[in-house]
């Protein structure tokens, strides 16, 4: 099941992708098919409803397969809908994991940079932007804008002191994040927040895939292309700290809540890792692909 936040005719809605070609407006479908109005207006609110929401969405998808003269009132072609980030306005900072792939840690320094414990930082919620949106170049403050293709985990059930064994019970699903970074600001300020939190530097999407559709997230492949050139190619199995380990570590003294976003780290091949570095410039297009989530595409303005 692939969920999305769509916009059509200046109206935002929670959508369910059907056959990778159509998108169902869940609120309108519920009203037409069941004469109910129980589905919240934002995906983050839907996530908080947990299994109840997922079961209801699955039921609506099954009903929509039946002959219905009013199908056009809640089912649209995906090509006519603007996809925003699945969670356009997170309620808190995006949790990010640094140097979680051995080769990336080495390209950023040396083997001494391979962490013994998860390196955790955050990005401001105002950084979030969607698939197809323009990313600001921020040329007035940085000359070292860099890309980082990442698998992101979205929490579905709140919890504290979550064990590795129970971690996946607290996951709602998976999406793609581009953790765009101003390397010079990151170095100058000796702390990641400013270099990671420029406006529009957290493209997310294009959809949020429910965990039931991804049985083995550790097998997911991450590929990043810049202007068509393959720059990053890695597997989630190469993470130093697995998704369950990250959830266990983060939740030991901090409550993880439904809708929280964890960007799990990037493989090697970032711009800074090349000699000379290949930083982003105005006009560059970045495509990050993780099947079956899809491809997150953005261009530098």
From Swiss-Prot:
It is found in: Cytoplasm. Induction: In response to ammonium, tryptophan, glucose, and phosphate starvation. Oxalate binds at residues 99, 196, 266. It catalyses: oxaloacetate = enol-oxaloacetate; oxaloacetate + H(+) = pyruvate + CO2. Keywords: Cytoplasm, Isomerase, Lyase, Manganese, Metal-binding. The keyword Manganese applies. Requires a divalent metal cation for activity. The keyword Transmembrane helix does not apply. InterPro entries: Fumarylacetoacetase-like_C, Fumarylacetoacetase_C_sf. Its EC number is 5.3.2.2, 4.1.1.112. It comes from the Bacteria. GO terms for molecular function: acetylpyruvate hydrolase activity; metal ion binding; oxaloacetate decarboxylase activity; oxaloacetate tautomerase activity. Its cofactor is Mg(2+); Mn(2+). One of its GO terms (cellular component) is cytoplasm. Changing residue 30 to A: Impaired subcellular localization without affecting the enzyme activity. Homodimer. This is Oxaloacetate tautomerase YisK.
